[in-house]
Amino acid sequence: MQFKRAWKQVDGVLLLDKPLGMTSNDALQKARRLFSAAKGGHTGTLDPLATGLLPLCFGEATKFSADLLDADKTYEAVLKLGVTTDSGDAEGQVTSTAMVDIQKEQVSEVLPRFVGDIQQIPPMHSALKRNGRPLYELARQGIEVEREPRAVTIFAIDCLDFSGDLLTLRVACSKGTYIRVLAADIGKALGCGAHLAALRRIVVGDIRLGNSVTLAELETLDEAGRMERLLPVDALLQSLPIVGVEGPEAERFRHGNPVSLPAGLAGKARVYAEGRLIGVGEPGHGGLLWPKRLVQLAD
């Protein structure tokens, strides 16, 4: 007799340290099964070759996952100098090799060129679509199409280590930044070429890797232990001010109706009733606080 899993409402945020070689969706589904969570989603894809912070949203937390998609990110990246690949990372075919005779002073001179607002041409080996087809499918057929440059922002690049032909960087950047494109561009500027050999995401928005858990660690815990690793839904909303509502106003907000706007509130706020999150509101028509997203947390 086949066992049928009993899915349940689980509301919260899991800070997962994604392992090497696993897709973001596979990591999500494995974590979801461990929690028996009826609904789940992740907050921005990490390639299989990348590790690190992958916030997972369960239940009502999925309503806020898009906010992290738009958040700034920080990565630790290892560049292999002297070797370029067609994909820009270690999975691709080698397209060129060169001797590496680079001094740290040259690295220090080149890196600042990439800080600020820059233009990146998305790689062919990416999930961007052309006429409904992902670019990586075209790339696998040997087809290359023209791609429009995209504006991204690099807030900071720090050299963490430089040894031989390996250059380790910490990169703080805006959403949509392709670190393997940055790696290739830095290699080109150094005159030797480069590809992305390893990538680890360490910050998403205000959330840091240090509070994360691995799938292997989750598998050793019982149900109570796993639930202790789950952050509340409002862990994604810590940058928003708090508004408290009571009685009839709380009921109005829960049913999608506006409530009184607190003095001085100019943007979105997280709204609580009796100490429980009931949604996010923002100022709107009539000088009132209008519901933007509502949540119904399980007891």
Curated annotation (Swiss-Prot):
Its EC number is 5.4.99.25. InterPro entries: PsdUridine_synth_cat_dom_sf (IPR020103), PsdUridine_synth_N (IPR002501), PUA-like_sf (IPR015947), PUA_sf (IPR036974), tRNA_psdUridine_synth_TruB (IPR014780), tRNA_sdUridine_synth_fam1_C (IPR015240), TruB_C (IPR032819). It comes from the Bacteria. One of its GO terms (molecular function) is RNA binding. It catalyses: uridine(55) in tRNA = pseudouridine(55) in tRNA. Keywords: Isomerase, tRNA processing. SUPFAM superfamilies: Pseudouridine synthase (SSF55120), PUA domain-like (SSF88697). Pfam families: TruB-C_2, TruB_C_2, TruB_N. The active site is at D47. Gene3D superfamilies: Pseudouridine synthase, PUA domain. The keyword Isomerase applies. The keyword Lyase does not apply. One of its GO terms (biological process) is mRNA pseudouridine synthesis. It is an enzyme of class 5 (isomerase). Responsible for synthesis of pseudouridine from uracil-55 in the psi GC loop of transfer RNAs. Belongs to the pseudouridine synthase TruB family. Type 1 subfamily. This is tRNA pseudouridine synthase B. It comes from Dechloromonas aromatica (strain RCB). The gene is truB.
